[in-house]
Regions:
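Classic N-terminal secretory signal peptides
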Residues: 1-22
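Cleaved targeting-peptide boundary
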Residues: 20-30
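Short, non-transmembrane alpha-helical segments in secretory-pathway proteins
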Residues: 30-54
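Conserved histidines in hydrophobic membrane contexts and catalytic metal-binding motifs
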Residues: 47, 55, 60, 66-69, ...
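Glycine-centered tight beta-turn/hairpin loop motif at sheet-sheet or coil-to-beta transitions
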Residues: 71-73
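Short, mixed charged/polar active-site loops
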Residues: 75-77
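A short, surface-exposed interaction/processing loop segment used at functional sites
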Residues: 85-91
């Protein structure tokens, strides 16, 4: 019974950490004005050119957030610089 409680507590803790990371990068990806940003479609195209299968994308807090599948089919969240499409972070 004690093992079940420990495993449950560990899983709950891990779920909280991954949920907190998935919300946002916590810092802007660029300081450039929005007039210099690429369109959301252009950001998605750049991610797809790198082998990602884009499922959803949005612009948030001066970052492009792209939810995609990598070449192995694993879910990933990409944070991209909206001025260039360069990947700044991957979770």
């Amino acid at each position: 019974m004690n093992k079940i409680a420990i495993i449950t507590a560990a899983l709950v803790g891990l779920a909280g950490v991954s949920g907190a990371q998935a919300n946002s990068l916590g810092r802007p990806c660029t300081s450039a004005p929005e007039s210099q940003w690429l369109s959301l479609e252009a950001l998605k195209t750049k991610a797809e050119a790198q082998g990602y299968k884009v499922q959803k994308a949005k612009l948030s807090a001066a970052c492009g957030e792209i939810y995609a599948l990598d070449h192995n089919g694993a879910r990933t969240e990409l944070f991209v610089d909206p001025t260039s499409g360069d990947i700044v972070a991957k979770m």
